Amino acid sequence: MGNCVKDNPLRSRSDVERAAVQLIEPLLPLLSPNKARLHLGDTGAVYPDDIAQMEAFARPLWAIVPMLAGHCESVKPLWEAWHEGIIAGVDPENPEYWGEVVDYDQRLVEMAVFGMGMALAPKEFFFDLPEKTQKQLHAWLNQINHHDMPKNNWTF
């Protein structure tokens, strides 16, 4: 029995799509109850667990967003979970709210994928959100304009 990811030749669009799903699907049971955080275990991060879990939630979006933009059918079950997580994560009244950021905050760098989502898949990533959530997403992302960031790869 081979390793389905290792044995994937990654030669075609469908190969890459299949690999992304194979890597992200096992994360679904690790999502928090409101799906705004992803607990991958204990980390060596120098920031609190809730921020590490928000980071873990955001990283798969780098694959999910292009799949949404490319209208890949296989992304739908993944997107349903991440869509629910975004709604919870930007809601200040939700216990899984991603919170108020501070200068040099890890969550600032994670905001980039949300911009990519709105640019590449605006319908799914923004316009399909409830109006209240659109405003909350804007407010949460807008925090970046009021905080310092290191002069490194965070400032794309």
Report residues per predicted region.
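Aromatic-lined, polymer-binding surfaces characteristic
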Residues: Q53-M54, I64-P66, V75, W79-F156
